[in-house]
Amino acid sequence: MAAVSLSVSTVKPLGDRVFVKVSESEEKTAGGILLPDTAKEKPQVGEVAQVGPGKRNEDGSRQSPEVSVGDKVLYSKYAGTDIKLGSDEYVLLSEKDILAVVN
């Protein structure tokens, strides 16, 4: 994971890219057993922090993104690039890797 000294407000995704703050992974099982870091699953849910301007169509126009800042999304398990800003973890991914908006 790349450790960089940026802030969320300075990250501007390009094209159809979406910058998502990763939700915290579960610390313990339903039975109360604490999980070590090596046993935790990579989270697939997060909150959209920044959105690019959208994908370019063949005619040069932009297709508006289907997600917006603040949306809670479910994304593909191995999608995107992991980025750590301070103590928070983010993933920069293509909009096509977002599977659903979670209400």
From Swiss-Prot:
The keyword Transcription regulation does not apply. Transmembrane segments: none annotated. SMART domains: Cpn10. Residues 31-67 are annotated as: Disordered. Pfam families: Cpn10. Keywords: Chaperone, Cytoplasm. The keyword Transmembrane helix does not apply. It is found in: Cytoplasm. GO terms for biological process: chaperone cofactor-dependent protein refolding. Its main location: cytoplasm. One of its GO terms (molecular function) is metal ion binding. GO terms for cellular component: cytoplasm. Together with the chaperonin GroEL, plays an essential role in assisting protein folding. The GroEL-GroES system forms a nano-cage that allows encapsulation of the non-native substrate proteins and provides a physical environment optimized to promote and accelerate protein folding. GroES binds to the apical surface of the GroEL ring, thereby capping the opening of the GroEL channel. Belongs to the GroES chaperonin family. HAMAP family: CH10. Heptamer of 7 subunits arranged in a ring. Interacts with the chaperonin GroEL. NCBIfam families: PRK00364.1-6 (NF001530), PRK00364.2-2 (NF001531), PRK00364.2-4 (NF001533), PRK00364.2-5 (NF001534). This is Co-chaperonin GroES. It comes from Prochlorococcus marinus (strain NATL2A).
